């Protein structure tokens, strides 16, 4: 009987493996053959790595790259001039598609239905969306019923047959199925939440629906607002790309970081909110920081550090021979500040201390009276580890699976008081002797 049960179990396990393999094969067959270049914004036109990568993915020298100025306001066509130069210096034959809300002599809705213009984009091997307001891109490329226009269908054809779709800032936000549309600062999102059709809206969905895209992520502390949107829409994973940095995604799965800084990977698949709290809270978020050269499989979420880090220092806080560089407690008064979260993650994985605290609040609101804020508690777990190298000329970390709990707090106000000269303080404060005699 035991042998029979074992045989049945083994057969079931084998069937499950075969079924999973077949499902993966079907997904691979249906997946677009092209690549995405998701740029966090503020890219430098003289840094060749990004532009060389876009052109290479579009087919190399002579690649036809269609540039969409749609997100820009003011002078969208003029804005594209430096971009055209950067791509053409890298070998492309790029052109600007006149789908814009100003500076062109035709209506946007007319342009996206123009057969000649649509065919020119369809024949391209790459598409590039510039920055601005992502709502302008979506409003142009979806019709009144929120269905794909002929122009968007042509863009999808470029992607499916092996071309590249690149976008910076607003052009990065549209990559996911859900995007921020016109969002206030991160602290305001933490306090007030998000509503579909207002702060968040439909993106164009080039990336898998389980992934949310955030841009200008580290410089502007936007990882916090991304967590609110992800939790609201039940999106388990997020990609936060920093400025002058890109995540290159091939065939929708294999992704590599290029550029100046890094990418934050947000995982709320096991996170829970406190149902007793009206304010936003989340427990057991996982954060990983990927630096230039690091790769991640978006399907399995397996991370491969850059070769320079694999050949240098591995940091395993749970190993018996763990010898961290830092030995101090960490408290960040503005965790939403410029690159604060990336700095914290690097120092926490390489520290004798196993947790760190960050606060998010408005100093202006708290100057005179109490105000609402949030505590971010970062802590290592059994799965936390990292790598370190100085090969790039600085302190570069790759950090995996730092845990995070967010909970609302009350900041006592006034936040501070001015000190008085000692003589004035003595005059205003009765001496102990005087108090006793009275």
Which sequence ranges carry the predicted segments?
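Glycine/threonine-rich flexible loop motifs
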Residues: 134-148
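Catalytic nucleophile loop
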Residues: 128-131, 154-179
């Amino acid at each position: 009987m035991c042998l029979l049960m074992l045989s049945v179990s083994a057969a079931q396990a084998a069937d499950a493996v075969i079924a999973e393999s077949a499902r993966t094969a079907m997904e691979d067959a249906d997946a677009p053959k092209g690549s995405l270049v998701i740029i966090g914004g503020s890219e430098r036109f003289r840094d060749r790595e990004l532009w060389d990568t876009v052109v290479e993915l579009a087919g190399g020298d002579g690649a036809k790259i269609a540039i969409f100025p749609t997100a820009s306001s003011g002078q969208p066509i003029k804005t594209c001039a430096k971009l055209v130069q950067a791509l053409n210096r890298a070998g492309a034959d790029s052109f600007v598609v006149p789908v814009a809300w100003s500076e062109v002599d035709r209506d946007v809705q007319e342009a996206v239905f123009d057969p000649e213009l649509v065919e020119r984009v369809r024949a391209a091997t790459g598409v590039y969306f510039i920055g601005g307001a992502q709502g302008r891109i979506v409003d142009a490329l979806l019709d009144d019923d929120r269905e794909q226009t002929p122009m968007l269908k042509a863009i999808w054809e470029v992607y499916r047959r092996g071309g590249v779709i690149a976008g910076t800032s607003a052009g990065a936000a549209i990559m996911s199925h859900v995007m921020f549309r016109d969002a206030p600062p991160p602290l305001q999102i933490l306090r007030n939440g998000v509503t579909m059709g207002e702060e968040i809206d439909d993106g164009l969905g080039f990336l898998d629906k389980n992934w949310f895209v955030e841009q200008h992520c580290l410089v502007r502390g936007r990882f916090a607002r991304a967590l609110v949107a992800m939790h609201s829409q039940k999106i388990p994973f997020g990609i936060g790309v920093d400025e002058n940095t890109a995540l290159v995604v091939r065939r929708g799965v294999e992704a590599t970081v290029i550029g100046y800084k890094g990418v934050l990977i947000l995982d709320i698949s096991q996170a829970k909110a406190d149902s007793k709290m009206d304010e936003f809270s989340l427990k057991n978020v996982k954060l990983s920081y990927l630096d230039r050269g690091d790769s991640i499989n978006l399907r399995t979420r397996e991370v491969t550090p850059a070769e320079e880090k694999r050949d240098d220092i591995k940091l395993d806080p749970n190993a018996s021979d763990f010898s961290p560089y830092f030995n101090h407690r960490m408290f960040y008064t503005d965790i939403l500040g410029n690159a604060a979260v990336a700095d914290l993650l690097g120092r926490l994985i390489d520290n004798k201390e196993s947790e760190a605290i960050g606060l998010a609040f408005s100093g202006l609101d708290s100057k005179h009276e109490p105000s609402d804020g949030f505590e971010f508690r970062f802590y290592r777990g059994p799965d936390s580890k990292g790598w370190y190298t100085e090969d790039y000329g600085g302190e570069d970390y790759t950090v995996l699976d730092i845990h995070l709990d967010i909970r609302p707090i009350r900041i006592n106000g006034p936040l501070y008081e001015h000190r008085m000269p000692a003589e004035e303080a003595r005059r205003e404060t009765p001496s102990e002797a005087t108090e006793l005699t009275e």
